[in-house]
Design a protein with these regions (language model features):
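Helix-loop junctions and short alpha-helical segments
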Residues: 1-77
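Sparse, context-dependent recognition of short Cys/His-centered cofactor- or disulfide-binding micro-motifs
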Residues: 4, 76, 82-83, 196-198, ...
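Noncatalytic linker/hinge segments flanking ATPase motor cores
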Residues: 5-6, 10, 136-142
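N-terminal short leaders/motifs
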Residues: 38-48, 107-108, 112, 167-170
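Amphipathic, Lys/Arg-enriched alpha-helical patches that create a basic surface
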Residues: 49-97, 105, 109-141
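Histidine-centered active-site/metal-ligand motif
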Residues: 100
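Beta-strand/loop-dominated core regions that host nucleotide or nucleotide-derived cofactor-binding catalytic loops
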Residues: 142-170, 175-229
Length: 229
């Protein structure tokens, strides 16, 4: 509770004022870090999912189970929740044994490498999940614009056809936010082509205009592109 224990340095007025400044767009603003980073429970999958849901970021478990990084790690087409839960539980148990007791047997090096690999991939899944939710929210509030949807992809060279939305503009070197099914990335536009002609910039004047674009990496069919206003 505020004003007790580890939170005795806080008071209700300062906490409310800090959040009001942040939500009102005041600059600079400050987060109440005590509320953000302190948690009594080990962050197992259900705890993480619950934390995200309380922030309005729903369906994390479904996102994680279908993400390519989890599919690659577990070598399954769709990863059961139990597989991710058990992986996290095993690491939490290992950490607890090391912190609060004695480990009878040292963990195999390959197991440690596998655990580290999982953590790296899982953190990237979390980053992409939050980024996707953020982009969707920013678009709904008019802070970014939708460029259109990819209707044809030419593979790993990064070239694709975008069916663009009226009113948007695209310029070489633009940073675009790319939302695919269970994946988020950001890339820069390397080239723009219309009717075989290379362009430096293009203003979209008609709905469903098709324009050729190229990014450094593969952009798949049905991906939706956004950019800052």
């Amino acid at each position: 509770r505020i004003d007790q224990g580890r939170y005795k340095h806080l008071n209700h007025e300062s906490v409310v004022n800090s959040y009001h400044a942040a939500l009102s767009g005041g600059q600079p603003y400050q987060f109440v870090t005590d509320a953000l980073v302190r948690h009594e429970q080990n962050l197992r999958l259900n705890i993480l999912s619950n934390l995200f849901s309380r922030l309005g970021l729903d369906d994390f478990e479904s996102w994680a189970s279908k993400h390519l990084l989890m599919v690659e790690y577990f070598e399954l087409d769709i990863v059961p929740m139990e597989s991710i839960e058990n992986q996290i539980k095993d690491m939490v148990d290992l950490r607890n044994d090391a912190s609060h007791g004695e480990i009878d047997n040292l963990v195999n090096v390959e197991i440690m490498k596998s655990n580290c690999n999982f953590v790296i991939k899982f953190l990237e899944v979390i980053r992409q999940f939050i980024s996707t939710k953020l982009i969707t929210k920013m678009y709904s509030q008019g802070q970014i614009v939708k460029l259109g949807k990819v209707t044809e992809s030419f593979g790993k060279n990064g070239a694709f056809i975008l069916t663009a939305e009226k009113g948007a503009s695209i310029t070489k070197s633009d940073l675009v936010f790319i939302i695919e099914s269970n994946k988020y990335s950001s890339q820069t536009i390397e080239s723009i082509q219309l009717n075989g002609i290379n362009l430096d910039t293009f203003k979209i004047t008609n709905d469903a205009s098709e324009i050729g674009l190229k990014c450094p990496l593969l952009v798949k069919n049905n991906a939706v592109l956004y950019k800052e206003i």
